[in-house]
Amino acid sequence: MRVLLTNDDGFDSVGMRVLRDVVSGHFAEVWVSAPARDCSAASRALSVRTPIKTHMRGEREFVVHGTPADSAVIGICEMTSTGKRPDLVISGINYGANTGFTVPYSGTIAAAAAAFDIGVPAIAISQQYNGKRCDNNVETSWQNSRKSVMALVSRLLRDTMWHGKCVMSINVPYSDVQGVKFAGHSCDDGHIKWDGPSMERREITSGDGRCVSYVFDDMRSPNSNDNASDTQLLEQGYIVVTPIGHSMTDHAILDKYCGLQ
């Protein structure tokens, strides 16, 4: 099998190095196409009508000056151009969980979704971190990902119920692993409200007058009251697997309006 690795934290991120180690020896060919810089929370953005500079690091590695979705699509196109379409795309391993309200913003999940959109089975993997996010992943232990990820990927590849029919998002806890659970993401019922990311505001005086600088810091999702949700199960120490599909329709509201027609 041929696998393409991508992410949103950047080509040289620690999570990508861990993912390379994890998949090494399990696939006939490993290709990498990832952003040149950290593109966290880039969601599904594509660089439309903009040249995307891409550096080649060997025949199977591409550093993309674009978004995570750009990186996934470019990687697939490069493989296809040599007659080697990927059998699987793995996006990650992200530094930080992608559960609940963070799912639509996640560049990690978006890169996997871009692959899924063009017919390639895709898995997104995220590693929960312990405490406040900091540079160089100092507070994150990747041990659980190293131990668990490849076994889960192999399990999904054998599973005829999945068979690439959606993006599979895997979240790995930083605490001792209690097992594996399948769950929906915790904003599905619409009852949980998010205050947005934590933000730092700075006033700046520059040559063109007074400006304000904003820094979005932490994208963690609020806790859900649903003990079976992805956010709660991850906090309880479970590896959480969430199937993510195309539809963004609120069918309950749609049915009410359709009933008035």
Curated annotation (Swiss-Prot):
Signal peptide, first to last residue: none
Cofactor (UniProt): a divalent metal cation
Entry EC number(s): 3.1.3.5
Source taxon at top rank: Bacteria
Gene3D superfamilies: Survival protein SurE-like phosphatase/nucleotidase
Keywords: Cytoplasm, Hydrolase, Metal-binding, Nucleotide-binding
Predominant place of localization: cytoplasm
Cofactor note: Binds 1 divalent metal cation per subunit.
GO terms under cellular component: cytoplasm
SUPFAM superfamilies on file: SurE-like
Enzyme class: hydrolase
GO molecular function terms listed in the Swiss-Prot or TrEMBL record: 5'-nucleotidase activity; metal ion binding; nucleotide binding
Catalytic activity: a ribonucleoside 5'-phosphate + H2O = a ribonucleoside + phosphate
Record's function text: Nucleotidase that shows phosphatase activity on nucleoside 5'-monophosphates.
Family indicated by similarity: Belongs to the SurE nucleotidase family.
Name this protein carries in UniProt: 5'-nucleotidase SurE
Organism: Anaplasma marginale (strain St. Maries)
